[in-house]
């Protein structure tokens, strides 16, 4: 959620930043709604003060009867009625909060202006792409290996699901353990095993609700399946005041993730790129406003390390204003090279959300010896999605005979297996 005080004091800049997100100017409407709310709040405070004064006089009167006493009682009763009506008006005046809840985060000054991914800015590349490399797509390879099943899985769950078997299931498990080990041992992230069913308020805190309600799966009893472990991890500091010396807090978690893929009809309908259920290792950092820019680079580098150790070519893109996520003020996308598609595809998003999520979930910190609190900054990064990483390994490590060479760093995690070959039932 955006800071209403900042909007109040920076109307023109607010409208300019909204325009960068391709949203029409809204400062005038917000000013009107904010003015109405502040007027009601001011009246409530005045009546509360008047009630306090009159109640004190009543309490100090020697005689608890007579015209003066009864007149003061009538005044207090009238004030209570006014207060009840005003407080009801304030509770019913939800339009301002509803409007603020629909605004995305304000883009950082470094974010390039643009409508879509074509305007994203290249930051750096890693590794060499080979235009003459073998170029079967991952699903062709997986099906030929008899270790990736879409057809039978569709009978169980429908489209956009997959069943992995044998050594591909083992590769999935190896990747999870490898990624967690790297992030905990080399990058100082603390491992968490969080719930994957969360309440709506947790989704709201992370910026998933109300705007993206249709993109998640809701149960019939008030829970939602998480679209990313970011939801569970950032909420670990909801409604808390953290001592400054404990920051930064860095969490890593592996979870299954669930997305309805609303609006993705016709996109990536084959294979494992876009599934309703997928596994992902997620990184979350909680830090101070002064350190969040450096922490953004840190968490991005942690994600990159996985691809570097797997020797997979990739590039880092700075997303433009029109391509950023709702809660982000600045995002790097990491895109891995897929020979089967002959293009880079997103494998990780690394975002600095500033105090956007913290304001929603009331997550603050304070210096030692101080009573003043400040909103924390939250950051998140994929570290990485297991399925898409497996896609990249299959396509970049494929051999002429359809077998898959295991990357060196995974051989121990695979129990010494160096190559995945076709499974014969």
UniProtKB/Swiss-Prot annotation:
Enzyme Commission numbers on file: 6.1.1.11
Subunit structure: Homodimer. The tRNA molecule binds across the dimer.
The organism's taxonomic lineage, starting at the top: Bacteria, Pseudomonadati, Pseudomonadota, Alphaproteobacteria, Rickettsiales
A Pfam family it matches: tRNA-synt_2b
InterPro entries, per the entry: aa-tRNA-synt_IIb, aa-tRNA-synth_II, aa-tRNA-synth_II/BPL/LPL, Ser-tRNA-ligase_type_1, Ser-tRNA-synth_1_N, SerRS_1_N_sf, SerRS_core, tRNA-bd_arm
SUPFAM superfamilies, sorted: Class II aaRS and biotin synthetases, tRNA-binding arm
Record's subcellular location: Cytoplasm
CDD domains listed in its UniProt record: SerRS_core
Binding site for ATP: 259-261, 346-349
Free-text note on domains in this protein's UniProt record: Consists of two distinct domains, a catalytic core and a N-terminal extension that is involved in tRNA binding.
Pathway: Aminoacyl-tRNA biosynthesis; selenocysteinyl-tRNA(Sec) biosynthesis; L-seryl-tRNA(Sec) from L-serine and tRNA(Sec): step 1/1
Annotated family: Belongs to the class-II aminoacyl-tRNA synthetase family. Type-1 seryl-tRNA synthetase subfamily.
PROSITE patterns: AA_TRNA_LIGASE_II
Single Gene Ontology BP annotation: selenocysteine biosynthetic process
NCBIfam families from the UniProt entry: serS
Name listed for the protein in its UniProt record: Serine--tRNA ligase
Catalytic activity: tRNA(Ser) + L-serine + ATP = L-seryl-tRNA(Ser) + AMP + diphosphate + H(+); tRNA(Sec) + L-serine + ATP = L-seryl-tRNA(Sec) + AMP + diphosphate + H(+)
Transmembrane segments: none
Chief location bin: cytoplasm
Gene: serS
Keywords of the record: Aminoacyl-tRNA synthetase, ATP-binding, Cytoplasm, Ligase, Nucleotide-binding, Protein biosynthesis
Enzyme superclass (EC): ligase
